[in-house]
């Protein structure tokens, strides 16, 4: 930046008094119309996003209250039961972002009287989804690969990050088909740090809902471990009791609704 200022000063101008009496580039920018970056080929499209034929494994379990509170901001209170749902998604067809896979723990919590589920960590497999999750939606995403296989009702899933298997799950499902699920609204914290590192350009809690269709699930039992998590904080959410496993497919329009819960600015 100092070098740029020196060049401007040598040319007889400064950053503060530069006028706009020149043609400029061909790209028009406006805060009312996001362009996406990089300009000529944005990494991802703008929402909403249609997910089609998602393959999903959910392990519902009870965890330690202390571990759950470690993962929650002070504005949120965990719901009774100390429930966590670990969700493994394979997404072969997603508008705007392309095929990918991701895994996230969802913690039922309330903001005042509003009940939703907070997502403290998320592992996604592509650079496009990583950037979109963090920049647009506020999901706390890092890179990680989700693998899921199923044969005759036996399901296996795992998450690999930096060559380490940090999450491993198995499930056995059978019985009647489940065509509807009570999926709580998601609560996210979106933060954009300021360039000086001393404050935030934006910081707020937002809640979103999904339009889930074409659900086809079966229920059963499961197991969940963190084999080689090292210092990854997701491993703090260890299960003390498995409640249920769900496995199946769905379509998802996201987001269906958006609402700001609290602006911290």
Please describe what each predicted stretch is.
Residues 2-22, 27-40, 135-265:
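Interaction-surface and assembly-scaffold signal
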Residues 65, 73, 126-128, 229-240:
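Short, structured coil/loop segments at alpha-helix boundaries
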Residues 91-172:
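Aromatic- and glycine-enriched beta-alpha-beta binding-site module
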């Amino acid at each position: 930046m100092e070098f740029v200022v020196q060049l401007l000063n040598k040319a007889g101008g400064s950053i503060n008094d530069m006028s706009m009496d020149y043609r400029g580039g061909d790209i028009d920018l406006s805060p009312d119309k996001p362009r996406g970056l990089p300009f000529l080929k944005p990494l991802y499209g703008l929402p909403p996003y249609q997910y089609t034929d998602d393959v999903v494994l959910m392990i519902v379990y009870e965890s330690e209250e202390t571990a759950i509170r470690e993962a929650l901001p002070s504005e949120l209170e965990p719901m009774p039961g100390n429930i966590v749902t670990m969700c493994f998604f394979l997404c072969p067809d997603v508008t705007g972002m392309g095929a990918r896979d991701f895994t996230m723990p969802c913690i039922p919590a309330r903001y005042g009287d509003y009940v939703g589920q907070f997502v403290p960590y998320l592992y996604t497999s592509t650079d496009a989804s990583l950037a979109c999750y963090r920049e647009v939606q506020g999901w706390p995403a890092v890179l990680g690969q989700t693998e899921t296989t199923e044969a005759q009702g036996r399901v296996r899933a795992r998450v690999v990050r930096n060559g380490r298997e940090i999450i491993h799950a198995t499930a056995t499902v059978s019985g009647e088909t489940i065509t509807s699920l009570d999926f709580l609204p998601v609560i996210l914290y979106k933060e954009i740090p300021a360039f000086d590192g001393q404050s935030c350009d934006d910081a707020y809690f937002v809640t979103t809902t999904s339009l889930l269709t074409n659900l086809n699930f079966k229920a059963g039992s499961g197991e969940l471990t963190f084999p080689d998590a090292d210092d990854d904080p997701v491993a703090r959410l260890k299960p003390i009791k498995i409640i249920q496993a769900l496995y199946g497919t769905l379509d998802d329009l996201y987001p269906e609704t958006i609402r700001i819960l609290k602006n911290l600015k």
